[in-house]
């Protein structure tokens, strides 16, 4: 914000390095230690103690307190380098400075390789701990060449020792001729024994190679037998699966045929039921029609009788030309129901209206 920013005034103390307490000789602790025989510059602790030899200048210096003002764990190091606060690209910068100072490329590459090896070792030790590779001997091999060579060297050393012993014995026993004659015999026997050992070793090597070849052949034969047995098992499984499938197909076919037969039977039964229902309905309709015909015939006869009764008053009214309404007397019988009865009633009403003069005059709007 510039000049408009809030101003924070900081006043420096008289002891910015905080060394007054360390230089103060009037404190209670300083005076107590002096009274006990301590002098400035000496180490803390008993001089005759068992661990006095491990005291260093750190025992005489002040204890430095570091305030933890971060969220890192105890002992955590800031930065991704090897040391505390080391930059990651510092080694590249050092190589560049070395080239400017006139160092050779071989020296720079050697230093870079050493730094990389150190980083790898530190990373491996942090992740997996210290690793030590110990030779445990030869585990698998057709020929144990190292052991054979070691045995040969051991036999050579034994021969050299035997020759030295023989020469010393010949010098000591030069006075007696009998001992001189006997002395070469054990040497020859020893030479023969060494040759026999070599021959036995060669035979053992040959037998071991033959055994290894036989074992390989046996392994191959076992593998081929296993493969053949597996193929046979697979064939048997496939045949069993095919037979199971054929059985399932047969069962499904038989089920489908039985279901079709059941369906045909069900359809025939349904058709018979439908026919029976239709016949019942027809019979009911015929009975209802007969009833309606009887009712209509009775209604017609009653209406005819009513018309005959009402003829005499209608003729008298025409002579006098007086319009008087005709009231139909109820017969007291139940009217027939149905479509035909309603139509018959409508026709009867039309006939009655045509026979009545007053109603005709009203229809044709003729004033009497």
From Swiss-Prot:
Comp. bias intervals (Acidic residues): 168-182
Biased composition (Basic residues): 209-226, 242-254, 271-283, 301-312
Pfam families named in the record: G-patch
Extent of Polar residues compositional bias: 15-27, 325-334
Residue stretches making up the G-patch domain: 25-79
BP term (GO), one: rRNA processing
UniProt keyword annotations, A-Z: Nucleus, Ribosome biogenesis, rRNA processing
Entry-linked InterPro entries: G_patch_dom, PINX1
Keyword Transmembrane: no
Location in the cell: Nucleus, Nucleolus
Region (Disordered): 1-28, 161-339
GO cellular component terms given for this protein: nucleolus
Gene Ontology MF terms: nucleic acid binding
Bias type Low complexity, positions: 313-324
Domain of life assignment: Eukaryota
Family designation: Belongs to the PINX1 family.
Function field: Involved in rRNA-processing at A0, A1 and A2 sites and negatively regulates telomerase.
Protein name, UniProt field: Protein pxr1
Species of the source: Botryotinia fuckeliana (strain B05.10)
């Amino acid at each position: 914000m510039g000049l408009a920013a809030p101003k924070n005034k900081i006043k420096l103390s008289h002891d910015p390095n905080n060394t007054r307490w360390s230089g103060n000789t009037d404190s209670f602790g300083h005076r107590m230690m002096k009274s006990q025989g301590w002098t400035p510059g000496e180490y803390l602790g008993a001089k005759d103690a068992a661990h006095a030899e491990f005291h260093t200048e750190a025992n005489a210096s002040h204890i430095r307190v570091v305030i933890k003002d971060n969220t890192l764990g105890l002992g955590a190091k800031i930065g991704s380098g090897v040391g505390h606060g080391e930059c990651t690209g510092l080694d590249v910068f050092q190589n560049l400075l070395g080239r400017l100072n006139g160092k050779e490329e071989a020296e720079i590459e050697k230093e870079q390789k050493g730094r990389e090896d150190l980083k790898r070792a530190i990373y491996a030790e942090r992740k997996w701990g210290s690793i030590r590779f110990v030779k445990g001997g030869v585990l698998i091999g057709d020929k144990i060449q190292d052991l054979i060579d070691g045995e040969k060297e051991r036999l050579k050393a034994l021969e050299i020792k035997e020759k030295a012993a023989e020469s010393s014995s010949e010098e000591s026993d030069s006075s007696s001729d009998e001992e001189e004659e006997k002395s070469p015999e054990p040497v020859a026997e020893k030479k023969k024994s060494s040759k026999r050992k070599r021959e036995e070793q060669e035979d053992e090597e040959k037998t071991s190679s033959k055994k290894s070849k036989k074992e390989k052949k046996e392994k191959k034969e076992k593998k081929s037998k296993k493969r053949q047995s597996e193929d046979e098992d697979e064939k048997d499984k496939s045949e069993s699966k095919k037979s199971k499938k054929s059985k399932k197909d047969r069962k499904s076919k038989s089920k489908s045929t039985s279901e079709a037969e059941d369906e045909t039977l069900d359809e025939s039964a349904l058709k018979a039921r439908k026919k029976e229902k239709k016949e019942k309905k027809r019979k009911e309709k015929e009975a209802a029609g007969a009833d309606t015909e009887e009712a209509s015939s009775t209604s017609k006869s009653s209406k005819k009788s009513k018309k005959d009764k009402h003829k005499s008053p209608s003729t008298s009214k025409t002579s006098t030309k007086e319009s008087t309404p005709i009231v139909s007397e109820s017969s007291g019988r139940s009217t027939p129901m149905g479509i035909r009865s309603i139509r018959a009633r409508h026709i009867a009403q039309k006939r009655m209206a045509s026979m009545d003069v007053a109603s005709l005059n009203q229809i044709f709007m003729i004033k009497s």
